[in-house]
Design a protein with these regions (language model features):
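Aromatic "clamp/platform" in nucleotide-sugar-dependent glycosyltransferases that forms part
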Residues: 91, 262, 281
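Carbohydrate-associated surface elements
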Residues: 154, 173
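Active-site donor-binding acidic/aromatic loop of nucleotide-activated sugar
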Residues: 240-243, 254-263, 269
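Short His-centered aromatic/hydrophobic patch
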Residues: 88-95, 114
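N-terminal strand-loop element at the rim of the active site
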Residues: 8-69, 74, 241
Length: 328
């Protein structure tokens, strides 16, 4: 029996929640599927995770960087490659070029997977154009999809509108055995990071506006002013790292905040922490909140995190509008 070929689109070069979910699904699929993953040109921070023999990586110009080059490269690629399924992992439907090229060069069934409740705003005219394209493609191209999925009800409404009843809600899942609490791992993690008896707060995710780490630093600063025996671990990479590091310096928090960058041992770091902060402006579901609850970690999340993320009494919601003082 020939292997089924699946084209995967929508992953970035920075390992985040979407990348984690997609790779987790791929690694659990039977070996009679072959996956071709399209990634933006440039260095991929998680290339070591593509160890499976049934995964092929194709680099392509990102649509947001140059739509014309993207159209040319994607068209040329699909002219010479045939797939059994196309799996689109999207934060919006604004990539009209993608839908046009797929319509012209591919007959494979399309699966659209919504991972968020809004696109990441950059300000100005670009945001307006993305929103207009999103709603245009919602009306014109959704009918071409064979299957519509979302990680939460809110993510479904954002991507597909509120009038459809054919959407599959697939809550982000984790390997519970991997994230279960272990006292030995907690002691080891705290020893390796020289945390001692400090109360440890944790931030995890791509360092970007939507994750709202700057607000978390304001919260941590107020906590530190009340109790000096605290430390903040910031896990992840992104465009705002330098800005956040500078803010720590201005707030005189450099000795109390550790930027750990991209890590493969998220489960290990969760063991060493006491509180997870999730101050995101919006989330599709928040994979890390599920992982943290499994590890027995207290979680404080913004009202941008869907209610579906609450699996235990360890997760508590606070509105961002209440401000840093209330959070602290």
């Amino acid at each position: 029996m020939s292997k089924k070929r699946i084209l995967v689109y929508g992953l970035s070069n920075i390992f985040g929640g979407v990348e984690s979910i997609v790779l987790s699904i791929i690694n659990r699929m039977p070996d009679y599927y072959n996956f071709t993953i399209i990634l933006p040109k440039g260095e991929c921070s998680y290339s070591d995770k593509f160890h499976s023999s049934n995964i092929c990586i194709v680099s392509m110009t990102a649509w947001g960087k140059n739509p014309f080059n993207f159209r040319k490269e994607m068209s040329e690629f699909l002219k010479h490659e045939n797939f059994d399924y196309v799996w689109l992992n999207l934060s919006s439907l604004s990539n009209i070029t993608l839908f046009k090229v797929l319509h012209k060069y591919s007959t494979a069934p399309i699966v659209i997977h919504s991972h968020t409740v809004a696109f990441e705003k950059q300000g100005g005219l670009k945001d307006f154009l993305i929103l207009m394209l999103h709603y245009y493609c919602q009306k014109k191209y959704l009918k071409a999809a064979s299957c519509l999925c979302a990680c939460s009800k809110q993510a479904a409404i954002w991507m597909y509108g509120d009038k459809r009843n054919d959407i599959k809600i697939i809550n982000n899942g984790i390997d519970a055995d991997k994230f279960g609490y272990a006292d030995a791992d907690r002691m080891k993690c705290r020893a390796e990071l020289n945390l001692g008896s400090k109360i440890v707060f944790l931030l995890m995710g791509r360092l970007c506006e939507v994750k709202n780490q700057s607000f978390a630093l304001d919260v941590f600063n107020k906590i530190h002013n009340k109790c000096s025996n605290v430390h903040l671990l910031v896990v992840g990479e992104g465009d705002l790292r330098s800005e956040l590091e500078y803010k720590c310096k201005v707030l005189s928090l450099s000795d109390n905040v550790s930027f750990l960058g991209f890590r493969n041992d998220v489960n290990f770091l969760l063991q060493g922490a006491d509180v997870l902060l999730i101050p995101s402006l919006h989330e599709g579901l928040s994979l890390v909140s599920i992982e943290a609850q499994c590890a027995g970690l207290l979680c404080i999340a913004s009202d941008g995190v869907p209610e579906e993320a609450k699996k235990t009494e360890l997760l508590h919601f606070l509105p961002l509008q209440s401000g840093a003082d209330s959070w602290a």
